[in-house]
């Protein structure tokens, strides 16, 4: 017990039945292998501080949730059931989780108390802030911070925080005490962008995925109120994300999220760019944004007056209280995003695209997002363009994991498959992959079978060598025996060897056969004729 470390991830795996029950209560289904993959490999890459061992910190969980629920190609719909289950476990922790969750102040169960009665001027509630009502009691001892152009923008730091039912802050405390008190009892928001909102907030809704803090919103007197970026926001964004040169896509997605959720002013945009980009990167982004300005005919224009009107480099005198001023600001943000996207494109390098391969435990959806990002970064092609779907599909097949790629190549009627069909088929193959235990068992079984086949082949070869050796020995023995027999038979017919002075006729020594006295002398007689038998005989 003392030598094992319990982590949120290991704790959920030990109580997996409870996790599945909680997921079922959320009307979702979760798998253990993907639960581990998302917690240890996917979510730590979101740059929101998610540890590989998991966490029950509701603030971090909601930040991951905002990434998962992001619209468009930056979202992760396949991870929704898992982050929703994490959130449910952290929001209402079961008994085995409570020792690992820090106590939190319970928010007021009732909605914020709004002024009621026949008041002639009830403070309106902003549609963007359904849980907030602006203060109606200004503090005259604090001077208001007005904008340079004399507009109605005011600093909410000089006002009392919005009233909340059941909880309030003493008006005798200073601004610093009020900020410190609210920060300690603040409920985590569903986005990493939380520190711009001063004062107490209601707990986020279950389906909330974006921050409710905006630099510009309607106040109690019907005028826009300005809340600037806090230094902690800028610090966290800069340190928790890669540089623009290193990963322009990720930083562009962050700035796009900030522009969408915070509605920053022109000054806020300059502060944001100056913090997150280097001087050279900022100049490149501004240049590309000005190139994206379109004229009245809808085509890109280079007329200085039109470019300066749409995307000014100097502080404009836009009146944000008017619809015209807000329209200018919306167009400026759109051009700024276009500049970020165009400036983030590197020179065409298809080798970089081909170098993007699926990781061993990477889901096909995550791999496809990395592949599309490589297309956007290293090629002039838009991977979302229907005309490029074939190229992206082929890259997806060839650069997938080997087991997935082989099965995708063998699909029937592959040419008619869309990219979505390929991704769904790849997800099915990915989810049916064998577990590490099954893979280990299969490798062990294959090794044993291979060893048995090798031994059988060795035994067969040894037997063949023995048979061949036996045949050769048999032939050799037969040859030896036959030679010995022939030697014995030939030895009987051979004449004995004679000495140098021995007679071949009488075998006596001292003379040769031609001088042998025992040899008959005289002419040879005719040979007797051999009578031949005839038919008459």
Curated annotation (Swiss-Prot):
Intervals of motif PTAP/PSAP motif: 109-112
UniProt-annotated stretches for the region Interaction with host UBE2I: 429-434
Post-translational modifications reported in the UniProt record: RNA-binding phosphoprotein p12 is phosphorylated on serine residues.
Molecular functions (GO terms): RNA binding; structural constituent of virion; zinc ion binding
Modified residue annotations for Phosphoserine: 191
Residue window of motif LYPX(n)L motif: 128-132
Region feature Disordered, mapped onto this chain: 107-217, 434-537
Biased composition (Basic and acidic residues): 434-465, 485-518
Residue span of region Interaction with host PIAS4: 344-392
Intervals of motif PPXY motif: 161-164
UniProt keyword list: Capsid protein, Coiled coil, Host cell membrane, Host cytoplasm, Host endosome, Host membrane, Host-virus interaction, Lipoprotein, Membrane, Metal-binding, Myristate, Phosphoprotein, RNA-binding, Ubl conjugation, Viral budding, Viral budding via the host ESCRT complexes, Viral matrix protein, Viral nucleoprotein, Viral release from host cell, Virion, Zinc, Zinc-finger
Annotated site residues (Cleavage) in this chain: 129-130, 214-215, 477-478
Top-rank taxon: Viruses
Zinc keyword on record: yes
Keyword Membrane: yes
UniProt feature coiled coil, ranges: 437-478
GO terms for biological process, alphabetical: viral budding via host ESCRT complex
Lipidated positions per record (N-myristoyl glycine): 2
Zinc finger residue extent: CCHC-type: 501-518
Protein name: Gag polyprotein
Gene transcribed to yield this protein: gag
């Amino acid at each position: 017990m003392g030598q094992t470390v319990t982590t949120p991830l290991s704790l959920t795996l030990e109580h997996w039945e409870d996790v599945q029950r909680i997921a079922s209560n959320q009307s979702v289904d979760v798998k253990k292998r993907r639960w581990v993959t998302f917690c240890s490999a996917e979510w730590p890459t979101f740059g929101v501080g998610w540890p590989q061992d998991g966490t029950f910190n509701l603030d971090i969980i909601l930040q991951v949730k905002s990434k998962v629920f992001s619209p468009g190609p930056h979202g992760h719909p396949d991870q929704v059931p898992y982050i929703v289950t994490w959130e449910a476990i952290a929001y209402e922790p079961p008994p085995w989780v409570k020792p690992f969750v820090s106590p939190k102040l319970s928010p007021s169960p009732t909605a914020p108390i709004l002024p009621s009665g026949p008041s002639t001027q009830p403070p309106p509630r902003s549609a963007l802030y359904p849980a907030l009502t602006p203060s109606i009691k200004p503090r005259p001892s604090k001077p208001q911070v007005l904008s340079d152009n004399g507009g109605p923008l005011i600093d909410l730091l000089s006002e009392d925080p919005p009233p909340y039912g059941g909880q309030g802050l003493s008006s005798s405390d200073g601004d610093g005490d009020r900020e410190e008190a609210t920060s300690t009892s603040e409920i985590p928001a569903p986005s990493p962008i939380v520190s711009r909102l001063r004062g107490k907030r209601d707990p986020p809704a279950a389906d909330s995925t974006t921050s409710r803090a905006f630099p510009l919103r309607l106040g109690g007197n019907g005028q826009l109120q300005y809340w600037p970026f806090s230094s902690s926001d800028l610090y966290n964004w800069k340190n928790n994300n890669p540089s623009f040169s290193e990963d322009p896509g990720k930083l562009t997605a962050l700035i796009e999220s900030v522009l969408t959720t915070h509605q920053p002013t022109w000054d806020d945009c300059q502060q944001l760019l100056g913090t997150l980009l280097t001087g050279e990167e900022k100049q490149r982004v501004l240049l590309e944004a000005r190139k994206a300005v379109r004229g009245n005919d809808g085509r890109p224009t280079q007329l200085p007056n039109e470019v300066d009107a749409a995307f000014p480099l100097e502080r404009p005198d836009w009146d944000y209280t008017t619809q015209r001023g807000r329209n200018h600001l919306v167009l400026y943000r759109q051009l700024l995003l276009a500049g970020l996207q165009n400036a983030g494109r590197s020179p065409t390098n298809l080798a970089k695209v081909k170098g993007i391969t699926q990781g061993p435990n990477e889901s096909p959806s995550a791999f496809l997002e990395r592949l599309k990002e490589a297309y956007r970064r290293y090629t002039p092609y838009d991977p979302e363009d229907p005309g490029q779907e074939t190229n992206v599909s082929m890259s997806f097949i060839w650069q997938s994991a080997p087991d997935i790629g082989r099965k995708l190549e063998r699909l029937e009627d592959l040419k008619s498959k869309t990219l979505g069909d390929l991704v769904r088929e790849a997800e099915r193959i990915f989810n049916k992959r064998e577990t590490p235990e099954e893979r280990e068992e299969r490798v062990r079984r294959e090794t044993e079978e291979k060893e048995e086949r090798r031994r059988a082949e060795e035994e067969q070869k040894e037997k063949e060598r023995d048979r061949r050796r036996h045949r050769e020995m048999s032939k050799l023995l037969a040859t030896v025996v036959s030679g010995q027999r022939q030697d014995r038979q030939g030895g009987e017919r051979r004449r004995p060897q004679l000495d140098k002075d021995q007679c071949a006729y009488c075998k006596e020594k001292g003379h040769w056969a031609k001088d042998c006295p025992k040899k008959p002398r005289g002419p040879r007689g005719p040979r007797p004729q051999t009578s031949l038998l005839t038919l008459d005989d």
